[in-house]
């Protein structure tokens, strides 16, 4: 589609692309320093403390149309909502991607098509802030629901 737009996103508090600073690299294109704009953030798998060479090439070639920041708590919130409301079990990065998609959808022209990839699963984040405050054991009500479906029973304890 000729009207395709590519939107990049990065953690709002670790805006290394938005900073405009380019990592120095060795002959193998590996970064030789930590990016000065890097800050710790909860979006695991995103934004290490350097710009990967393949990403720098894409930035240099202007292979994207827009760069939008996303706050870590928004990613966590959307990841939880996707699980609870849609049955999509994704990690914080998937929730963060979806948060930006929802932001873009708010102003997209009527009839626009948005393709959003959530190449992640929530399973690997069970011990992270994503699941903070969620009990490990099923409630009596959840156990009853589980037992009402003989082919998919969960045993607690």
Residue ranges and their predicted role:
Residues 1-90, 129-157:
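Active-site/ligand-binding loops adjacent to catalytic centers
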Residues 4-5, 112-114:
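Residue-level recognition of the N-termini of beta-strands and the immediately preceding loop/turn
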Residues 8-10, 115-119:
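Short beta-strand segments
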Residues 16-17, 93-101, 125:
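Short glycine/serine/threonine-rich phosphate/pyrophosphate-binding segments
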Residues 73-75, 95, 122-123:
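Short Gly/Pro-enriched loop/turn and capping motifs at secondary-structure junctions
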Residues 89-93, 110:
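Helix N-cap / loop-to-helix initiation motif
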Residues 98-113:
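Structural signature of the thiamine diphosphate
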Residues 118-130:
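Short, mixed-charge aromatic SLiMs
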């Amino acid at each position: 589609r000729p009207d395709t737009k590519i939107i990049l996103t990065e953690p709002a508090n670790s805006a290394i692309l938005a900073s405009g600073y380019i990592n120095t690299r060795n002959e193998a294109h590996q970064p030789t320093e930590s990016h000065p704009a890097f800050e710790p953030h909860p979006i695991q798998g995103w934004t290490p403390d350097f710009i990967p060479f393949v990403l720098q090439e894409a930035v240099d070639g202007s292979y994207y149309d827009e760069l939008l920041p996303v706050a870590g708590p928004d990613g966590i919130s959307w990841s939880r909502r996707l699980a609870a409301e849609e049955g999509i079990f994704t990690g914080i990065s998937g929730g963060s991607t979806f948060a930006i998609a929802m932001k873009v959808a708010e102003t997209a022209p009527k009839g626009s098509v948005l393709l959003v990839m959530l190449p992640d699963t929530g399973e690997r984040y069970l011990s992270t802030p994503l699941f903070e405050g969620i009990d490990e054991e099923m409630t009596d009500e959840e156990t009853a629901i589980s037992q009402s479906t003989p082919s998919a029973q969960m045993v607690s304890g």
